[in-house]
Amino acid sequence: MSNQRIRIRLKAFDHRLIDQSTAEIVETAKRTGAQVRGPIPLPTRFERFTVLTSPHVNKDARDQYEIRTHKRLIDIVEPTDKTVDALMRLDLAAGVDVQISLG
């Protein structure tokens, strides 16, 4: 797989899960002899929701909630066949969304 690059984007709501998954991917790639660039932390997305607590009146009574989406980017430069095989077998946490692209 010469002149290839694997770009892995991770998304999660919990920053501890995404950091743990990132560490597993980086350690697996380095163990199989590939060069790793990253992990690069991408901007965290904040989604805020405001909900009226009262069903009828009292517009001043509100609750606010937010969801934070943490993102990381990992580039694996010059991956070997062992690297691809090891990454395919890797079992990551359930709360982490993984997008893989070859470039």
Swiss-Prot record:
* Gene Ontology annotations for the cellular component aspect, listed alphabetically: ribonucleoprotein complex; ribosome
GO terms assigned for molecular function: structural constituent of ribosome; tRNA binding
**Ranges annotated as spanning the membrane:** none
InterPro entries named in the record: Ribosomal_uS10, Ribosomal_uS10_CS, Ribosomal_uS10_dom, Ribosomal_uS10_dom_sf
Alphabetic keyword roster: Ribonucleoprotein, Ribosomal protein
Q: Tell me a GO biological process for this protein.
A: translation
Entries under SMART domains matching the protein:
Ribosomal_S10
Which NCBIfam families does the protein's record reference? Answer: PRK00596.1, rpsJ_bact
State the family named in the UniProt similarity comment for this chain. Answer: Belongs to the universal ribosomal protein uS10 family.
Q: How does it assemble?
A: Part of the 30S ribosomal subunit.
Task performed by this protein: Involved in the binding of tRNA to the ribosomes.
Protein's recorded name: Small ribosomal subunit protein uS10
